[in-house]
Every structure is written in structure tokens, then in C-alpha cells.
């Protein structure tokens, strides 16, 4: 297993390992630049097929061929796809998450950032799977633009990206429902997060929530065809991106 990760404490990975080893009440404290502290149970990363949101189940149904699961967490999607007979490579930047996936039986696991040159070692994939607001892995608008180009080196001919994201503009609504944010400032969907577990605080990281119109603009500018497969009443959506 090759790695390309920082030396910062792996709060997410440690929480998942704790759950995997029997501490079923393990929870992460998540701080962000847009909302107050949130509590994220480690159990959420271990959900079964029927505990997954409908949008995630739809994404699994739409997978085809060789799958690269990016930001795979504890491996719930990779394990489900394995059960269905898919060949899956699961990747996460968290060493603890990778260890959990190995313990749970994900057959092919690697510890990488999504931009690592060694991510696929030249292999091409039919499906790039990016769930749990997976577009966020790209971090920023610049990162999104960079990833859309990078993904072209990962996709086999006829391949697809299946990804979820959300429009978080509702966080900026005033009491009358009007949007209030600085049009000259950073894109409102760019968020900074920090995760805490036990006595560990992970390094701050950037995450992007791309509204559908923005995602479509960036993807089409990069040469992708865009198909929105599903949206829900919480402004989350599932999108398929393909190259001609």
C-alpha cells in the first residue's frame, strides 16, 4: 500500500477504527466555517444497503465495469459492489479508514489523495464513484476544475463519473428567504472543516458543495456531458458525467 498523506492526526480514521473494534458509540465532532459544531456518528460510515439514502442506492445501480471508489471511508459502497460481483478499488486519504476497509474485507484498497499521480498506476476505470457529497473531495473551485481534467486520465473509453453534491445556499437565506452573501467573496459552497475525535484534531481541510448550475458549467467547460440522475428536497443531487 502506498501512501501520500500528511502527518496530522487521523481523527476520522481513529473514530472508524474505534467503531470497527467495538466502540459502537464513537462519534466525531465536526467544525466548519459555515455552521456550528456537528456530531457525526462513526456508525454512519458502516451503513448497510438499506440504511443508505435512496440517492446512494441509485448510484450503486448505475455503476458499471471496473469501479474506483474515491473517498471510500469505511468501505460500505465498495463492499456492496463487491457483493454484486464488481471489481472495485477503494481509495481514501485516511490511513485509519484504509485499515478499516482491509479488516472489513474490501479486496483492493489504497491510501491516496485524489490527485496523487500514483492513484491508479496508469489503470483506467469505467466508473469513478464519489458519494457522500463526493464532489467535495476536490476542495475548491480550482480543485474542481483540476479534478475534471485529472479524471480524464482515470476514465476508460465510455467511462463515467457518478457523484453527489449539494447546494448549501439555504444557509445564507435571511428571514424573508433572500440570499445574503458577498458576491465578491469566495464561492459560498467552499467550506473549511476540522474533525475531532477523542484527543485528536485532524488538519483543517477544504470541501466544496457545488450547486447544480455551477457543476454543470464547470463540467461542460471541461468537455463532459452532464446528466442529473436524481435530486431530493434537501438540495442534494446525483450527477453522471461522461466524455464524448
Walk through the language-model features, giving the residues of each.
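Conserved SAM/SAH-binding beta-strand->alpha-helix loop
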Residues: 94-95
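S-adenosyl-L-methionine
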Residues: 1-62
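A short SAM/SAH-binding and catalytic strip from SAM-dependent methyltransferases
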Residues: 125-145
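SAM-dependent methyltransferase
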Residues: 2, 6, 14-20, 156-214
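A short glycine-rich, Lys/Arg-flanked "PGG" loop and its adjoining helix->strand segment in the class I
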Residues: 144-157
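Conserved class I S-adenosyl-L-methionine
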Residues: 64-73
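Conserved SAM-binding strand-loop segment of SAM-dependent methyltransferases
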Residues: 105-116
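Conserved SAM-binding loop of SAM-dependent methyltransferases across substrates and taxa
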Residues: 74-85
